[in-house]
Amino acid sequence: MLTLVRQSLVVTLLLAALLCGAYPVLVTGAAQALLPGKANGSPVMVDGRVTGSDLIGQHFTGAGYFHGRPSAAGEDGYDASASGGSNLGPTSRTLAEAMQARADALRAENPDWKAPLPPDMVTASASGLDPHVSPQGAAMQVARVAAARGLPIKSVARLVEEHVEGPQLGLFGEPHVNVLRLNLALDALAGGRAEGN
């Protein structure tokens, strides 16, 4: 009996040392060596300081910035500590009302957009922190952003086109635009930040 207890303790301690110590150190070291930016959360640096992440959406509200997808993460959205969707089903009246309110707000913000609204601009992502919008979601905002920044519409539209990323490995997913990267490029094009965030 004592032998079994000792063997169990030895195995437990060895596995704890291996799985709680050696394995995490090895994986972290390999990630830092092979993919240092991605291993640290894909930070986006501006003037030597972290401004955001390529992987986590931010809430932009100013008329001079492109806005991301709606977020259901946390009470006010975009709360990384409360990542998650609304969990509302397709028959939910609450979801239908939220989508209608978002659609009305989008039409009010972007009155020049006459095409149907892109679905990603009225629906929250599963994580609530999606950093991307569809190319159509960015295109619908071009006139508003250009007017707020005093830029030619063609220049802003070209900037959107330059920031469209294709599917991963050419097969997985849809074309998309990283909103943070697009807004930083917009700041560079316009020569500074706009009012709002």
UniProtKB/Swiss-Prot annotation:
It is a single-pass membrane protein. Keywords: ATP-binding, Cell inner membrane, Cell membrane, Ion transport, Membrane, Nucleotide-binding, Potassium, Potassium transport, Transmembrane, Transmembrane helix, Transport. It comes from the Bacteria. Signal peptide: none annotated. Its main location: membrane. GO terms for cellular component: plasma membrane. Disulfide bonds: none annotated. The keyword Repressor does not apply. GO terms for molecular function: ATP binding; P-type potassium transmembrane transporter activity. The chain crosses the membrane at residues 9-29. It is found in: Cell inner membrane. PANTHER family: POTASSIUM-TRANSPORTING ATPASE C CHAIN, POTASSIUM-TRANSPORTING ATPASE KDPC SUBUNIT. Part of the high-affinity ATP-driven potassium transport (or Kdp) system, which catalyzes the hydrolysis of ATP coupled with the electrogenic transport of potassium into the cytoplasm. This subunit acts as a catalytic chaperone that increases the ATP-binding affinity of the ATP-hydrolyzing subunit KdpB by the formation of a transient KdpB/KdpC/ATP ternary complex. Belongs to the KdpC family. HAMAP family: KdpC. NCBIfam families: kdpC (TIGR00681), PRK00315.1 (NF001454). The system is composed of three essential subunits: KdpA, KdpB and KdpC. This is Potassium-transporting ATPase KdpC subunit. It comes from Nitratidesulfovibrio vulgaris (strain DSM 19637 / Miyazaki F) (Desulfovibrio vulgaris). The gene is kdpC.
